[in-house]
């Protein structure tokens, strides 16, 4: 029998006032439902906006549940649910709360400051149903089960919307997911404050890792059995309209949370390999993965210190704690498990690749080499920098001085260069 999905759950973690969230909600309520066979849509709003609650714990988003609001859309095929968090769960955990509570097997994740394309749900349904098509003899055209559909993402630029990201995107908004696959493979978002920003990456990496080792579950990319113009995803506003990027601490939040994500990914990979007997098979790939993430952590750590030392920025204590703890964890994983197998060329290649082919904010080390970082540590006043508390870190940063080229002027290489290039006498 040909498969026909019942409907799609759209999950949105909510914060901010209605002027922001209305656009997302209306983009869901105005979905094209299909001409002859309307698709059912469940919109699950997960209210994490505790600061916006009334004294009676009333949610601003209860407006979307009123009879007055229900007059604005097709309530036969669209249902709105509201879940109110009793404590902050932040973006990732709120998404997970939403899709676990959803009634349909398939779900889409959309942020409250994003919008879905008008035909997103109908296109996803068409692609999923097409995957399970049967011929006249009742035989499936495709084998296996469908875990997710990749879609396109669009962002708005100076000339309207433009093609932004296709395919293996790290943004969770770019896919429609099968909840059964997610649950079977223990794919989770980070928890606590690590769930607040930068949470997309570990979720997608875990999902893709499980997919790459599964012979039954598959993923397909748009376009699928259709023209190249099919647009099955979110219109996305990553810059001017992004609530998270309006946070003045956004960049340094990401420093610690990205490192927490790296640890979360590594731990998932290792647990998955152990569970499925893949430890020997994946050993070389894991060595490469841990080295990559530790090199990234090395540069991230340096950049954080430089940012504090050379600007007026005052980081949050929690951001420093998240950064130092998670960099320390990555360093320990690399040193304890893989370091004896790593050769000089591995390190040099990775340093180059992370520097030139990643989004890292590069800062040249004034403390020593990556080898020094792993084997000796970087010290100040007889204490490893990764063990400094917040106050000590601020004191240390006051001892640093960076020139216009981003070099720390007291570093050995800068001092050596100055000795070889003395300034000409002012009188000559």
Regions from the PLM with identified roles:
Residues 29-84:
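Acidic donor-binding segment of Leloir-type glycosyltransferases
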Residues 73-78, 94, 117-193:
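Flexible acidic/His/Gly-enriched loops in nucleotide-sugar-dependent glycosyltransferase catalytic domains
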Residues 107:
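Short aromatic/hydrophobic "clamp" motif used to bind/position activated sugar donors
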Residues 111-115:
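The conserved acidic donor/metal-binding loop of glycosyltransferases
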Residues 2, 227-428:
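C-terminal subregions of glycosyltransferases and related glycan-biosynthesis enzymes
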């Amino acid at each position: 029998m040909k498969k026909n999905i019942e409907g799609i759950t759209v999950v949105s973690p909510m914060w901010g006032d209605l002027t922001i969230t209305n656009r997302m909600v209306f983009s869901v309520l105005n979905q094209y439902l299909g001409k002859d066979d309307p698709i059912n849509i469940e919109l699950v709003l997960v209210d994490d906006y505790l600061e916006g609650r009334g004294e009676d714990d009333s949610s601003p988003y209860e407006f979307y549940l009123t009879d007055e609001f229900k007059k604005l859309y097709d309530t036969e095929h669209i249902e709105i649910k509201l879940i109110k968090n009793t404590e902050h769960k932040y973006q990732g955990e709120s998404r997970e709360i939403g899709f676990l509570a959803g009634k349909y097997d398939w779900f889409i994740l959309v942020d409250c400051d994003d919008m879905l394309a008008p035909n997103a749900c109908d296109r996803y349904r068409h692609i999923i149903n097409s995957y399970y098509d049967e011929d006249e003899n009742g035989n499936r055209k495709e084998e296996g089960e469908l875990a997710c559909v990749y879609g396109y993402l669009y962002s708005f630029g100076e000339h309207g919307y433009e093609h932004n990201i296709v395919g293996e995107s790290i943004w969770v908004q770019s896919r429609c997911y099968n909840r059964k696959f997610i649950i079977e493979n223990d794919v989770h978002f980070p928890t606590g404050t690590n769930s607040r920003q930068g949470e997309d990456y570990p979720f997608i990496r875990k999902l893709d890792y499980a997919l790459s080792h599964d012979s039954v579950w598959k993923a397909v990319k748009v376009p699928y059995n259709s023209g190249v113009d099919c647009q099955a995803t979110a219109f996305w506003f990553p810059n001017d309209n992004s609530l998270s990027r309006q946070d003045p601490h956004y960049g340094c939040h990401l420093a610690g949370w990205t490192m927490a994500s790296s640890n979360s990914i590594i731990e998932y990979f290792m647990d998955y390999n152990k569970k499925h007997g893949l430890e020997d098979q994946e050993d070389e790939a894991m060595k490469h993965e841990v080295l990559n993430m530790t090199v990234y952590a090395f540069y991230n750590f340096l950049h954080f210190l430089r940012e504090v030392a050379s600007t007026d920025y005052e980081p949050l204590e929690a951001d420093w704690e998240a950064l130092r703890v998670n960099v320390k964890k990555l360093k320990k994983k690399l040193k304890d498990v893989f370091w004896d197998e790593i050769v000089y060329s591995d390190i040099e290649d990775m340093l180059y690749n992370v520097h030139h082919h990643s989004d890292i904010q590069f800062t040249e080390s004034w403390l020593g080499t990556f080898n020094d970082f792993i084997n000796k540590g970087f010290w100040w006043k007889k204490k490893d920098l990764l063990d400094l508390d917040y106050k000590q870190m601020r004191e240390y940063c006051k001892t640093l001085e960076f020139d216009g080229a981003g070099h720390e002027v007291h570093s050995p290489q800068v001092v050596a260069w100055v000795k070889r290039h003395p300034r000409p006498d002012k009188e000559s």
